[in-house]
Curated annotation (Swiss-Prot):
Keywords: ATP-binding, Cell membrane, Membrane, Nucleotide-binding, Translocase, Transport
Gene Ontology MF terms: ATP binding; ATP hydrolysis activity
Gene name per UniProt: ssuB
Main subcellular location: membrane
UniProt domain ABC transporter: residue ranges: 3-231
Highest classification ranks of the organism: Bacteria, Bacillati, Bacillota, Bacilli, Bacillales
Name of the protein in its database record: Aliphatic sulfonates import ATP-binding protein SsuB
GO annotation, cellular component aspect: plasma membrane
Source organism of this protein record: Bacillus thuringiensis (strain Al Hakam)
EC top class, as a word: translocase
Membrane topology of this protein: Peripheral membrane protein
Oligomer status and interactors: The complex is composed of two ATP-binding proteins (SsuB), two transmembrane proteins (SsuC) and a solute-binding protein (SsuA).
Catalyses which reaction(s): ATP + H2O + aliphatic sulfonate-[sulfonate-binding protein]Side 1 = ADP + phosphate + aliphatic sulfonateSide 2 + [sulfonate-binding protein]Side 1
UniProt binding sites for ATP: 39-46
Amino acid sequence: MTVLINEVSKYFSKQTGTVQVLENINFQLEKGDFVTVIGPSGCGKSTLLKIVAGLDNDFEGEIIIDGERITKPSKKQGFIFQEHRLFPWLTVEENIAADLSLKDKYVKDKVKEWVEIVRLDGFEKSYPKEISGGMSQRVAIARALLRDPSVLLLDEPFGALDAFTRSHLQEVLLNIWEQKKTTMIFVTHDIDEAIYLSNRIVIMSAKPGKIHKVIENNLPYPRSKTSESFQEIRKKVLQQFEHGGLIQTSI
């Protein structure tokens, strides 16, 4: 077992009182799982991801990764935000290395490996302002995976990108997953993206956020979004939104 989300609930305090954001979230991921999380805006998807990342420890319940209770960020979790958050004064390879020294041969070799995996060969010495948004997200992916985390957490990482770039980065991410079998939790608003990438789809309901349904996705890779089997799963997901009353809010 890689990740256990056990009885997780979350509350926010406001002037009008206490608001429950998450209610009794229970979920387990095995090593190599690729899970996508979808649901209405405000259902707590990103909040849950931050809790798993150790970025928010004010919650009820527990997060266990590789048998260890998580209370803060560690090398067990890699996190990718919607914005790439690169350091503008560092080059591509320096951003991937982050706080590690490129003078260390092991680090330099690992950076070189990830530059090749995310297809940034020739841009190692470039600065963030000199590369595109899609390339910047590839740098962020490589940086998050450099330390071989137990789980990679992605919070709508392709949401701000154009359709072509998003499609390209989906292929890059799947290639990484197939090579490394890193456990991944990917939050998205895009149903097609959720089906295309993952082997399990977690559908959340809102107010408070809870798991409404988990759909197994056994479509073989590579996948075609126009195939009959893909459309069948899409129909199944949409039915959950309609029958569960989740379609009232934008997804």
